Amino acid sequence: MTAPFTPAEIAAEGIKPEEYEDIVQRLGRHPNKAELGMFGVMWSEHCCYKNSRPLLSNFPTEGERILVGPGENAGVVDLGDGLRLAFKIESHNHPSAVEPFQGAATGVGGILRDIFTMGARPIAILNSLRFGNLDDARNRRIFTGVVDGISHYGNCVGVPTVGGEIYFDPAYSGNPLVNAMALGLMETEEIVKAGASGIGNPVLYVGSTTGRDGMGGASFASAELTDQSMDDRPAVQVGDPFLEKSLIEACLEAFKSGAVVAAQDMGAAGITCSTAEMAAKGGVGIELDLDKIPVRETGMVPYEYLLSESQERMLFVAQPGREQELIDIFHRWGLQAVVAGQVIADPIVRIFFQGGIAAEIPATALADNTPIYHRQLLDQAPDYAQQAWQWQESDLSPAAIAGIEIAGQKQSWNEVLLTLLDSPTIASKHWVYRQYDHQVQNNTVIVPGGADAAVVRVRPLDAKPEECVIGVAATTDCNARYVYLNPLEGAKAAVAEAARNLSCVGAEPLAVTDNLNFGSPENPVGYWQLALACEGIAEGCRQLNTPVTGGNVSLYNETLDSNGRPQPIYPTPVIGMVGRVENINKVVGQGWRNSGNGIYLLGSNDGNTLGGSEYLAVVHHTVAGQPPQVDFDLEKAVQKACRHGIAQGWVNAAHDCAEGGLSVALAEMAIASQLGAEINLPDSDQRLDNLLFGESASRIVVAVAPEHQPAWENYLAGQSLPWQKLGVVGTAQGNLTFIDAQNNALIDLPVSALTEPWQTAIARRLKS
């Protein structure tokens, strides 16, 4: 019997003492080094979701358009006309913190493999990114490195990066979030799944060679970031986008041949994960001979083979007798392809090396029957939240027509608006997306920054572009400050905003993929945030009929402060949502089209709050209060009206009110069109700063040409939602003017003055 490992050796694999005892009991013996490593990666939070799985079970996962839900490499929805969309979001947070370029690049590569492993051709990439403030040199290095990595991989692989979101906040200093989402188009009914089947069927290793890069990446991603994390740079993988481009084509050709029974990419935990998951999902076993695996380094031992996360690798189960056909396809594309094993009846993963058995573990022990922790939920909100909820608007200085006093200094509303437009979270992300190739494949309908959601034309390979009018819209959304202050309501708001952004381009929301980025679940506060956010997501998705098709959980996003205490990020449940566009020729952006168009607000300002707002954080340097709460009946009514107006051709511009409230939304529409506007604010008992900069759900600003306004207003009169005409689009080089009910000009600025800080905010900070 193998000698027991020391506690330090066990802990080094991320395994708790009680988990090691469980392993010994399951095997009936002590594991060897390779087996211990296999358990370490497969029982990590990154792979088995041992703290989050009970919470995820509450998500709605079924719907009339859902073809594949959670459990496969990606979700799949039915677009109609024989077309299907595969989509998924995943994180690469920890690798991007220690090696920003490669961490972000391989995050893109990994999510693309999830898509084409299903048999779908990748058609778009989106990203949800979070960084610390750019006045810190390390944060600037991480930010520029991540953007470089995303652009390098996406541009080289030939898939357009079409949208996403970027936030900056001290909560992410040293622990960035890099969440990558991808979409893929399927033209056949055949969906490639991961479950192995067919006793005796050959198992093929295809793609790149195996090296020592990415060793233990899954375990690394399941631990807090510390001062020693830079020593874990070998746990960051190195990607080759040109090789991945060949892998995409080879895999799609192989799937089309009908010779592939099942497929699984080698992502987290590499060979260990792909063999265990394929075997467990199929209820069979897999034997694999490591001596057959193509390598790029000499002297590798089983532990290294099994835990390597070298990129651009796949595992196939093939139809018997058709191995050579598949091998020839991959060789033609300049890729490795070998028969490395077979499917067996005994449901175990058996690994051979140099004529002996290197590892032998029941497949379900690695991939299905893993530890699950049911943690106790706090019976009341933690102290930080209760203290934050004590804040009231009356704690601020009075808001007068001339402005507000902040730290002894009078600021006009003009100055406040310019300050918000200069906030990197609100400001233009042009510095970022100008580095992305967003037009490759020639199907991008709206360029990044042009609308509230990305829109891509759905074009089958053999179709003429002019014949294709169906599109797909996609977005990633989460205001993490809301979730920090109230995880339940903040998560609902994230789902609602994602659907609202799709509705702003005229798309019907279909389904969700989620990326749960949180701190340690072993901290009662962290688990409270996670549990309530999951409850909020479930509620939001049920209300809006957008089932969850899968996603990713990234926990232990924490750094240590100067006293060695863990500092978690803001809880950040990113919602990736996709929608169907009936006719891409009717899609609208956020910029006003023409002078003289009417400007309308769908929804009401009555639900505005300064709690958790960008105004409160940026202008008053305060994070407190209750965030906005979603009225889903109102939310659905507002979105329905917006979609209907776009479909009828009445609405020619739409933009939701998010960070910065009504004033920032209108300023962004003015900047996008370079047209001014005169806005008449309604009479209100609200504070002026709440009316101007307060935030709430369920508000969309739209523009309508004069000839369509009677029909539009007649339609709205028959709907059960509040709305009002705010004003009229002005002229080029005009001013954006806000006038209150007493005819006072609260804000009056040339569009050029709005544009300058908004357009240059990020670039200026990078030069500092």
From Swiss-Prot:
Residues engaged in binding substrate: S91, H92, N93, H94, R113, Q237, E309, S310, Q311, S554
Cellular localisation: Cytoplasm
Family: Belongs to the FGAMS family.
Protein residues bound to Mg(2+) 1: E90, N552
Binding partners and assembly: Monomer. Part of the FGAM synthase complex composed of 1 PurL, 1 PurQ and 2 PurS subunits.
Residues the record lists as binding Mg(2+) 2: D114, D265
InterPro entries: PRibForGlyAmidine_synth_PurL, PurL_linker, PurM-like_C_dom, PurM-like_C_sf, PurM-like_N, PurM-like_N_sf
Protein name: Phosphoribosylformylglycinamidine synthase subunit PurL
Protein source organism: Synechocystis sp. (strain ATCC 27184 / PCC 6803 / Kazusa)
GO cellular component, one term: cytoplasm
EC number of this enzyme: 6.3.5.3
